[in-house]
């Protein structure tokens, strides 16, 4: 079975990309257990807690990321450099238990996947 990586690299409420990626991730998890999730660049905002999307009239799909554990999706990583660049390395609270990795280590993890889908 192919290993599939989902890379979230966009902000959560600027487009439908994050929501569509999450839908694809949950659907794919029914077909394979070899799934990894990566949050890089602005994608680190996808799982930042305390967001209020209703202020910009957006749907709060962020809470759906909490379901990853129920779908047995446990391989989640954050880009440590992206966190630093956005001032999120200390005190930030995330709704998913994701492991921060430096870019080189993150690339090493991504190399373990056969298919990479970017949202």
UniProtKB/Swiss-Prot annotation:
UniProt cross-references to Gene3D superfamilies, sorted A to Z: DsrEFH-like
Biological processes annotated in GO: tRNA processing
tRNA processing keyword on record: yes
Subcellular compartments: Cytoplasm
Assigned GO CC terms: cytoplasm
SUPFAM superfamilies assigned to the protein according to its UniProt record, in alphabetical order: DsrEFH-like (SSF75169)
Record has 4Fe-4S as a keyword: no
The entry's keywords: Cytoplasm, tRNA processing
Entry function: Part of a sulfur-relay system required for 2-thiolation of 5-methylaminomethyl-2-thiouridine (mnm(5)s(2)U) at tRNA wobble positions.
Assembly, per entry: Heterohexamer, formed by a dimer of trimers. The hexameric TusBCD complex contains 2 copies each of TusB, TusC and TusD. The TusBCD complex interacts with TusE.
NCBIfam families recorded: PRK00211.1, sulf_tusC_dsrF
Family: Belongs to the DsrF/TusC family.
Protein name: Protein TusC
The species this protein was found in: Citrobacter koseri (strain ATCC BAA-895 / CDC 4225-83 / SGSC4696)
Lineage: Bacteria, Pseudomonadati, Pseudomonadota, Gammaproteobacteria, Enterobacterales
């Amino acid at each position: 079975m192919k290993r599939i990586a989902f890379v979230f690299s966009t902000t959560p409420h600027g487009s439908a990309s994050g929501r569509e990626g999450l839908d694809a991730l949950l659907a794919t998890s029914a077909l394979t257990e070899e799934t990894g999730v990566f949050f890089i660049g602005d994608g680190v905002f996808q799982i930042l807690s305390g967001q209020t999307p209703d202020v910009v009239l957006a749907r709060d799909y962020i809470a759906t990321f909490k379901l990853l554990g129920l779908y047995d999706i446990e391989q989640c990583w954050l880009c440590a450099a992206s966190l630093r660049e956005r001032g999120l390395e200390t005190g930030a609270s995330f709704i998913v238990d994701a492991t921060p990795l430096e870019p080189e280590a993150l690339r090493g993890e991504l190399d373990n996947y056969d298919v990479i889908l970017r949202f």
